[in-house]
UniProtKB/Swiss-Prot annotation:
It comes from the Eukaryota. This is Putative uncharacterized protein DDB_G0286285. SUPFAM superfamilies: ACP-like.
């Protein structure tokens, strides 16, 4: 499973914007997902079995992807 594409697809489904148009160097707020932070976090945590810190969710999308990849490695 490709973490980056899965994370971008999940964000895409929440903000109704194609995953290809989401810049990983932007924040969820930049993408118009400020009010969806908790919901996106919950879906990511459930899908990957992680507990992403809210401070990470407020940062760049690339940081969220890195956190999921890091957490996934420690779980396996």
């Amino acid at each position: 499973m490709n973490v980056k594409s899965t994370v971008l697809d999940l964000i895409s489904s929440q903000i109704y914007k194609p995953a290809e148009m989401i810049d990983p160097n932007s924040t969820l707020g930049d993408q118009g997902a400020t009010f969806d932070l908790v919901e996106i976090k919950g879906k990511l945590d459930k899908k990957f079995g992680t507990n992403i810190p809210m401070s990470t969710m407020n940062g760049k999308i690339s940081g969220i992807i890195s956190e999921v990849e890091k957490s996934k490695k420690t779980i396996v």
